[in-house]
Swiss-Prot record:
Domain of life: Bacteria
Quaternary data: Homotetramer.
Family listed: Belongs to the isocitrate lyase/PEP mutase superfamily. Isocitrate lyase family.
Pathway: Carbohydrate metabolism; glyoxylate cycle; (S)-malate from isocitrate: step 1/2
Cofactor(s) listed: Mg(2+)
Keywords from the named record: Glyoxylate bypass, Lyase, Magnesium, Metal-binding, Tricarboxylic acid cycle
One Pfam family it belongs to: ICL
EC number: 4.1.3.1
Lineage, broadest ranks: Bacteria, Bacillati, Actinomycetota, Actinomycetes, Mycobacteriales
Keyword Signal applies: no
Name of the protein this chain belongs to: Isocitrate lyase
Gene name in the database record: aceA
Kinase as UniProt keyword: no
Catalysed reaction equations from the record: D-threo-isocitrate = glyoxylate + succinate
Length: 606
């Protein structure tokens, strides 16, 4: 049967929904948020059949409000990433208000279709949402079980029994978005459908994504990160969910970027000031070819490229002048004679020498540093150039390459500088990573995100304060997040036990409202399993008895596992009529032989 409508009716309903959506955009919840689309574009993609996402919407609304309260009070949530649904429920029951779900644990865990592996986001787009769905389902079940048990308590029992908040306040790992706008939208849609209210998106390049504390990270330009954040917000608006978007940057420890197109990234591009040096790409490929020609056939990356003989000759001559070819020959001879060390390790040693030698001979630096060096020389010679090195440094910190070059021309300064010479064989540009770059990346993302996160190489309050102060100088109400990573060796951070204890509290004072141990649950799971397995081998069933004693001592709900997982709720439908106020029928008083609940004299802990 066809649905009949009139053009007037359709237009009226559409116009009303556009107006309502614009009103939603203008809500104080989104103060300072920029959307690169209109309310009309959102409504055009909603269709006519209403679809509601109650769990995600309500959780997002309440979670955001709570984070705002914490920000205003200079406090924070300190949490970790659970490795199982039981851990997620335990987190909430122990008073930790929010949960982190990271791709690290998802990678390490594997699935029915994916092998366990490192944190490279090499799993399907659906895998983290699938992991999140299990956590959300566990939290909702815990809430139902709690409600059922409390309804069957006396008033005195309810007063003596705390009620826990099992709302799924979760921020989940959206990695790089797994591709373009459509991939980001698909990923956010999956998170919303299963009830997740928060998502973090990072500025690494898909396909080369690394764990935040691994080397070799390749960034995308600032405009690409903004596109991801904007696509996420667009999908949330279509679904009418005020989700919490976290913009993560890896710029503090990254050294590569896949494009120089965005002006905000250009102050951090590295280039050669010795324009006669062979390109880094040519030197690297010549090094690989040298190993290959000496019989190390495992190294053959140069065969991917079509570098000309002239470039190879120039690069090989440079390697020879640096003494690197002689080192290659000695390394290969030693490897062929004993083979005790892997060829990858040996190549890495030579590669490090190549990198250090090339950077030194190339005079690798940013364009701003190249001009500043000339200004300092002129100043030392008593020349009046028109701008001091300090003034230039302040100007060039956020200037595009075009603007910087134009200003240098005005000053009569023209350093030889070429960032193309420093490109890697893959075509990536080298950059000057660090806190200043992370600040620049985050300032660009701030109008499109609810929370900013700078991934760091170690735990350092001074670095955190520098970042927070720079962000809040321009965005005073911007909430921040901090990774309390297990990848750090916290005993080598230089902090005392008391300083480590107060670390999350101090972060809260700076505006870091969501602070998390990414894969803490993975380590808890492993250590607990190792300890119990060891005890079981040594002490037999005494190991279990000791565990049960501990559960009874701390009144853990794990001492009654059937009740914990909802046994009473599961049996309700069979043992009494639907209306709990109605007088039970005689048969309802008889416990069936198939009941999952224990008999009165059973000594089990159910």
């Amino acid at each position: 049967m066809a649905i009949m409508d009139t053009n007037t009716e359709v237009h009226t309903l559409f116009t009303q929904e556009v107006a309502a959506t614009q009103q939603y955009f203008d809500d104080p919840r989104f103060a300072g948020i920029i959307r690169l689309y209109t309310a009309r574009q959102v409504v055009e993609q909603r269709g006519t059949i209403p679809t509601d996402y109650t769990v995600a919407r309500d959780a997002a609304t309440a979670f955001y409000a709570r984070l705002r309260e914490l920000f205003a009070a200079g406090k924070s949530v300190t949490t970790f990433g659970p490795y199982s649904p039981g851990q997620a429920v335990s987190l909430k029951r122990m008073g930790i208000e929010a949960i982190y779900l990271g791709g690290w644990a998802t990678s390490a865990k594997g699935s029915i279709t994916e092998d366990p592996g490192p944190d490279l986001a090499s799993y399907p787009l659906s895998q983290v949402p699938d992991d999140a769905a299990v956590l959300v389902r566990a939290l909702l079940a815990a809430d139902r079980n709690q409600q059922y048990l409390r309804l069957h308590m006396t008033e005195q029992q309810r007063a003596a029994t705390p009620a826990y908040d099992y709302r799924p306040f979760i921020i989940a790992d959206a990695d790089t978005g797994h591709g373009g706008d459509s991939h980001v939208r698909n990923l956010i849609r999956r998170f919303v459908e299963i009830g997740v209210p928060g998502y973090h998106i990072e500025d690494q390049r898909p396909g080369t994504k690394k764990c935040g504390h691994q080397g070799g990270k390749v960034l995308v330009p600032s405009d690409e990160q903004i596109k991801r954040l904007n696509a996420a917000r667009f999908q949330l608006d279509i679904m009418r969910v005020p989700g919490i978007i976290v913009a993560r940057t890896d710029a503090e420890a990254a050294n590569l970027i896949d494009s120089r197109a965005d002006e905000r990234d250009q102050p951090f591009l590295l280039g050669a000031t010795n324009l006669k040096i062979p390109s880094y790409k040519a030197c690297f490929l010549a090094l690989v070819r040298c190993f290959y020609e000496l019989g190390v056939k495992e190294l053959h990356g140069h065969l991917l490229y079509a570098l000309g003989d002239g470039e190879y000759a120039a690069a090989s001559a440079w390697l020879d002048r640096q003494g690197i070819l002689a080192q290659v020959s000695g390394t290969v001879n030693a490897w062929q004679e004993n083979g005790k060390q892997s060829i990858d390790d040996l190549f890495e040693q030579v590669e490090y020498r190549l990198l250090a030698a090339w950077e030194k001979d190339a005079g690798l630096m940013t364009y701003g540093e190249a001009v500043e060096e000339m200004l300092q020389f002129g100043e030392s010679e008593g020349e009046l150039i028109g701008m001091s090195p300090e003034e230039w440094r302040r100007f060039v910190g956020r200037a595009s390459l075009y603007a910087a070059r134009e200003k240098a021309k005005e000053l009569g300064v023209d350093p030889g500088w070429d960032c193309e010479l420093a490109k890697t064989p893959e075509g990536y540009y080298q950059i000057r990573g660090g806190i200043q770059y992370a600040i620049a990346k985050s300032l660009a993302a701030a109008p499109f995100a609810d929370i900013l996160w700078m991934e760091t190489k170690t735990a350092d309050l001074a670095d955190a304060r520098q970042f927070a102060e720079a962000i809040h100088a321009e965005f005073p109400e911007q909430m921040l997040a901090y990774n309390l990573s297990p990848s750090f060796n916290w005993d080598t951070t230089g902090m005392s036990d008391e300083e480590m204890k107060r670390f999350p509290e101090e972060l809260g004072k700076m505006g870091f409202v969501f602070n998390f141990i990414t894969y803490g649950g993975h380590q808890i799971d492993g250590v607990a399993a190792e300890e119990f397995a060891t005890a079981l081998r040594q002490d037999g069933m005494l190991a279990l008895a000791r565990l049960q004693r501990k559960m009874r001592l701390v009144e853990s709900p794990y001492r009654t596992p059937q009740t914990l997982v909802g046994g009473p709720v599961a049996m309700q439908r069979w043992l009494r009529p639907p209306d709990v106020r109605r007088q039970p029928r005689p048969w309802a008083k008889v416990r069936p032989s198939t009941s999952i609940l224990c008999r009165p004299r059973c000594r089990r802990s159910c």
